[in-house]
Every structure is written in structure tokens, then in C-alpha cells.
Amino acid sequence: MSFRKALWALGVAVCLAAPVAVHAQGDYLDVFVVKVKPEKLADFQALTKKWVDANRRFNGDHWLTLETVYGEGNVYMFTSTRKDYAEIDKTNEASMLAANKAFGKEGGQKIEQDFDNCLVWSRSELRRRRWDLSRKAPTDPDGYAKLIGESRLLRTTAVHVRSGHVPEFEALLKDMKEAGEKNPEAPPVLVSQVIEGSKGSIFYVSTLRSSMGGFDHNPTTREILGEEGYKKFQQINADAVEIAESTLYRFSPDLSNPPDEVAKVASDFWHPKAMMAATSKTKTAPKTAMEPVVAKNPDKKP
């Protein structure tokens, strides 16, 4: 469905056996990536905001939207979590119903057509979250929501693995997970694997930060693995990896409809308009209370 595929993309951490509570966050990432025509950028954003509003008001789908900071320009990524394949149909139906309630059937179809006309290209992927390969992943739903809710940037590396080399690449990630979890300075790393919508085997290795400064002064791969481990890392990369593409994204709250548990972590960021409206009402309330009687009952003109 192009536009209806909302998302909540983020994935590459490192734990050999993920806790049941973390699995409750969903085992799949439903990802929709688009490149927007430069001259259509304003239209794209306006249409997306309409879709956000419809899904928010009528209990449709939830997703996070990210836009490129470093990488191919005018690229946006919409990401949602799914617990299984069946939930994909369920959430798509909820999103369609929300659009029909907000715009009418024909109006919803018109918005989708206009949205498609804004795009240079689009791509859909279903990714399985590899908790067994992820490092320092949160151990409960609240911890996961806090990690996502406080994040403002996502650095993700798409690793294309050569045919026949997936087992050794997975073994390397497990070695990196084990070594990284012993290093108190190593940040969380989330790993996912494309299972629908790709050519060949692709893994996404991702890290989240609350600001650009969070990418400074992190331990290097050599420091985490040690000299022998780093040599093994280089050898397996040379043998198993066809290409690795790194992109830095920032979260776009105005184009997102985050799950409530994520939004409440930083509501001023994820729901800025709602917070501004609440603040405005608070500020104007005293004026109404202090309004003079004359103003409430202005003189009638003949």
C-alpha cells in the first residue's frame, strides 16, 4: 500500500536470547522508504501531516518517520512494529478505516494518489528483529519505549552479505555482541534482517542517539574486539560482505504517529502542537477570569 505502510524502524542490537518482555515490542519492522521530488517536498509533508492527523484521531496505525541527514537526499523512512504477519493486514485495515472516516473513501484515495505523485521512488521491506544478534537491548517494554522516545537520531548500516556467507556473518555479530556487552562504554546496537522485499541477504545494524554529540567519543570496533578479534572482523568482512551502506537519519515528529508509550516519554517533542495548545490555554485562562465587566457587555450601537 504505499502511504498506508507506517513504520517504526530501528533495528540492530546484540543479545543471544532476548527477554520475553522485549519480544512483546514486536518481532518485525514494517518499513516504507521513499525519495521525494524536490519540487514536491512541501506537498509531501502536508499530505503526510493529514494522514498523521487522521490516524491519530480515528485510532489507525502508529509509525515513526525519519528523514535523511547524511545519505541520499529527500529520503524518508516510515517504520512500524508488527508482532506477526497477521498484524500487517489488521493495521492496514485500521489505517484505511481511519482515512475513510477523516476524508471519505474518495478523499482518502485522492490523498494516496497525490502522495504517490510526490515520489521519485518507493520501497517496502519487512525486517525481522534479530534480538539474538543485538547488543544491550532494553530488557522490558518501558525501557525500550524510553530508548526510542528519547532518541532524535538513527545511524543505520545496511550490510549486504554474499550468498553462502550468512552463517559466518551472524557468528561475527554474536562475537561483537559478547565483547560489546562486556564493555561499559559500548552503546546499544540493534540488528534486523530483511525477510521480504530485498535482493539477497541484507542486515541492518543501527544505533540511536539523543543528539549529534552522542556519536562522539564512542569505543571503536578495534577497542571493543581487541587486536585478534579485530583481525577476524576484517577478514570476515572481506570474505562475507558485498557492500555496506551507512545513513544517518533524524526523527520527524510532525510526520510521525508514535505509539503512546513512546510519545509520553517526551511529549513536547513527539506531540509539539498538542503541547503548544495546552500551554496557550493555560496562559490565556487568567485573562478570561480577569476580563472586566465592561468588556463582557460592550455598549450596544444604535
Locate the predicted segments by residue.
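Sequence-pattern detector for short linear motifs
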Residues: 7-8, 290
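Short S/T/G/P-rich N-terminal loop/turn motif that feeds into the first structured element of a domain
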Residues: 23-231, 236-302
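N-terminal secretory signal peptides that target proteins for export/translocation
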Residues: 1-5
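Bacterial N-terminal signal peptides
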Residues: 9-18
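Small/flexible residues
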Residues: 6-7, 157
